[in-house]
Design a protein with these regions (language model features):
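Conserved SAM-binding loop of SAM-dependent methyltransferases across substrates and taxa
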Residues: 47-59
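Class I S-adenosyl-L-methionine-dependent methyltransferase module
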Residues: 56, 60-172
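S-adenosyl-L-methionine
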Residues: 1-35
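Conserved class I S-adenosyl-L-methionine
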Residues: 36-46
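Short intrinsically disordered, low-complexity coil segments enriched in acidic
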Residues: 1-4, 46, 157, 169-173
């Protein structure tokens, strides 16, 4: 199951419940390599499990993901080897700019307003606006988007069900 991935580098960056075990994928890739197969086509790439494991095993891979949100997650994960020091300085710069931004808007869509306190919504909005306004290299911009997306669950006091659906009225425990 994908739950196993939450202990693995890169795979644990995003909890994708529709995914499957990276260890199992790696085992299959190694097995097929012994049969001389060194190319993989994944028509449902999801969050990139097969593509990442292919890269780790030196196997050429191609993936297709139709959902734009999930595609962006996979793309950010596949850029995992971007220089960490450069990313860190860019991410901290983005955060500093967002902290300096004042959001006065208080009206947000009902679903958003029911999932987050107004102070959190305004901070998230500042992050989003700063991200949209900031020019960055594509890999860094994608990864910063990924980080902002990844904190949405933890910044909300609303709980989630097993399949990540929101549960209004249930708090994180």
């Amino acid at each position: 199951t994908f739950a196993d991935n939450m202990k693995m580098p890169i795979h644990k960056w995003y909890r994708y419940t529709a995914g499957f075990s990276a260890s199992w994928v790696n085992q299959l890739i190694r097995q097929e390599k012994t049969n001389g197969r060194t190319r993989i086509i994944d028509p449902f790439a999801g969050s990139g499990t097969v593509l990442l494991e292919s890269e780790f095993e030196g196997v050429e891979s191609f993936g297709v993901e139709a959902h734009p949100y999930i595609y962006k997650i996979a793309k950010a994960k596949l850029d995992w080897n971007f220089p960490a020091d450069k990313f860190k300085s860019e991410a901290l710069s983005l955060l500093r700019k967002a902290k300096a931004k004042t959001i006065t808007k208080t009206e947000f869509p009902k679903l958003i307003a029911s999932c987050y306190p107004i102070e959190i919504i305004q901070k998230l909005e500042a992050l989003k606006q700063t991200w949209l306004e900031t020019e960055q290299e594509e890999e860094i911009k994608n990864f910063n988007w990924f980080i902002i997306t990844s904190i949405l669950r933890t910044t909300s006091p609303i709980g989630t069900a097993q399949w990540q659906y929101i549960q209004i009225g249930r708090a994180h425990v």
